Amino acid sequence: MKTKTIFQLVALFAIGATAAPTGCGETRDIQAEAVKPRDVAASQTLHLDARSDIIKGGSSNLERREIWYWCRIGNCNAAFKSLAARCRHEKTAVHIAPESDSDSE
């Protein structure tokens, strides 16, 4: 009976040890998350405790940039606000050239 109890305790310890967090995984410090207002230089960051002050000041204080996606084919200078729009554009007949017609002449 004593052996069975010892075995159960060892098994319980083994299960607990494998289920317990080891700290080896990706850990992120919440305080390291930062928000950059327009007035702050690129090398400076603000911690989350100062974030509430920025939010109270309004979202206009935060720097927001539009992302543009440019056509990657040839000399086309088309710009799009979404990746899906760029992909649709690249698949259009504008960029699907027929086999070179100049070879048949």
Swiss-Prot record:
- What residues form the membrane-spanning segments? none
Q: What are this entry's molecular-function GO terms?
A: zinc ion binding
Alphabetized InterPro entries for the sequence = Znf_C2H2_type
* Major localisation: secreted
Its job: Probable secreted effector that translocates into the nuclei of host cells to reprogram the expression of targeted genes by binding on effector binding elements in rice.
UniProt lists the gene as HTR7
Compartments where found:
Secreted; Host nucleus
Q: What is this protein called?
A: Host transcription reprogramming factor 7
What triggers production of this protein?
Expressed during multiple stages of host plant infection, including the prepenetration, late biotrophy, transition and necrotrophy.
Q: What is the source species?
A: Pyricularia oryzae (strain 70-15 / ATCC MYA-4617 / FGSC 8958) (Rice blast fungus)
